[in-house]
Amino acid sequence: MANLIKLRKGLDINLKGKAAAEVVAVKEPGFYTLCPDDFTGVTPKVVVKEQEYVMAGGPLFVDKNHPEVKFVSPVSGVVTSVERGARRKVMSITVQAATEQDFEEFGKKSVAALDGAAVKEMLLNAGLFAFIRQRPYDVVADPTVAPRAIFVSAFDTNPLAPEFELALSGEEANFQTGLDALAKIAKTYLSISVNQKSPALTQAKNVEVTVFDGLHPAGNVGVQINHIAPVNKGETVWTIDPQAVVFIGRLFNTGHVDFTRTVAVTGSEVLKPAYVKLKVGALLTGVFENNVTKDKALRYISGNVLTGKQISANGYLGAFHSQLTVIPEGSDVHEMLGWIMPRFNDFSTSRSYFSWMMGKKKEYVLDARVKGGERHMIMSNEYDHVLPMDILPEYLIKAIIAGDIDRMEALGIYEVAPEDFALCEFVCSSKMELQRIVRDGLDMLRREMC
């Protein structure tokens, strides 16, 4: 029987605009873009030229430090642009999809007949290794370092998060094959929600299943690692999102890559929130067109409101994202008395407004305003109330700001990723950019230690 872990700390932010449990058709996008910045820790080296034809699964760029780690095209077509920024930094590579799709063939493989080294080689050749991240540092995994374990979180507790069970429908065999492949490399842990009932999750084979019950961030893989098998200095673990596990299963079962995700289109400004099928890097114009509020300043996000990336209405789906969100920008809002005005429709963790009297099921419409400037850091334990990890978050943040590596190590920086502090950032009365601070701290530590 699966182990049950109940979390008492956390906070659910109930927003308006949850996706209906249906998959709607959208016009196939004509362009796909990969951004190296989506793959944290990678120094890209472009291996294609503009106007060159690539097949789906063909490499677009590799990691300079580990050339065996390839980042491949999700579709076949012509490379229309290689965009560079300051100091020739590679910003993005765009491919115009061909009418007829051609695939790099990697050959169907029986996972049972392979060992861990052969599985890893297959993932590297097909570009799927790029979707595996490692702790410490929360970067694309180093293929030369053997992981102690691999963690998969099969549920998401972020605001308006997609239901993985809907995405899993019809992909059960591919998901199990993906788990089988990962289990060949290292012991694999699968974390599921107490509300998930799919046999593909509750009865998954070759993995250790753990059931979590709690508020957000219970779905964060970092929180799960902290409660199952914490990361110590000198240890490495891998993490991978569940839809990328499906990618792996498709590779072994079909012999070619298929980066199609089931994506939730959410947010208070989406007219018909629902699910769509999109490949990684897809142009999103057709998704938002005639499906968002008009005559209003909007914030488009690839991902969720806490950890997602701001994009334009003509942006692209992020490599690791299975959610799109549209909320009001808030730049055109003028409120009498500002934030001190009594109200029933604004969310507050400290009951500053009367909205808490409306019950936990009330759906809120929140905009992108910070509503305040950065202030001195207040040691009020407000982070502790929403972070169910065995660390001292406020002291860790102070150690990162001070650049004290010894203190950072002692306070648990090897276990965390920026997303683990997203909720802390939301409730922070000092308005500090905690995710950026943690990212800077991890980068500094990696430069010193690697």
Model-predicted segments: where are they?
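N-terminal, Lys/Arg-enriched amphipathic/low-complexity engagement segments
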Residues: 1-47, 62, 212
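Active-site-adjacent bridging/hinge elements
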Residues: 31, 51-54, 149-151
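Short, solvent-exposed loop/turn positions at domain surfaces
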Residues: 42, 48, 65-68, 272
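Short, well-structured beta-strand-loop connectors
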Residues: 48-62, 81
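Short coil-to-beta-strand transition motifs
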Residues: 68-76
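Buried, small/hydrophobic-residue-enriched core segments of structured protein domains
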Residues: 69, 83-450
